[in-house]
């Protein structure tokens, strides 16, 4: 977990691009709060949030711990519960943590089995997405050598040779993969935003 908000502090930060950005002040956090880098939550398209029990940790610090459970929220933006020891929360600590979230989000504490199953499902989902894009890029690069040629006018493609109308080196993908990546980034960062999608296509066309 990467700490963005220290336990007991009103100062909140966001971890972006390998560094901290100051967000502002809020009521003091009852726990250390941050994110799990590289693990995305489809509920908001952002990296999974986590809370870390124990003494305050510095913003930007990387902390590892045991998965004790999670705070499940109605909007799907669940928070993993981490700690160095397996003791977990006492009833008063649990009540303070749940009270930190608005009642409309219906915060509920779940155990390590439920939390582990959720994390596993997220990783499997990411693996499928990565596999889809990897398959797209490999197939695109493999077919670049015969792009635009009518079926039956070329021998069976069995190796990565490159060439084709764009004279690409072996292993290079075409505009198909490039524009698919533009679309994926737009959907992740902006949701369904046709203007943002078109802006990215135009920027790719001009700048590559």
List the predicted regions and their residue ranges.
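Hydrophobic N-terminal alpha-helices or hydrophobic patches in metabolic proteins across all domains
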Residues: 1-124
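Structured, active/binding-site neighborhoods that engage oxygen-rich ligands
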Residues: 122-208
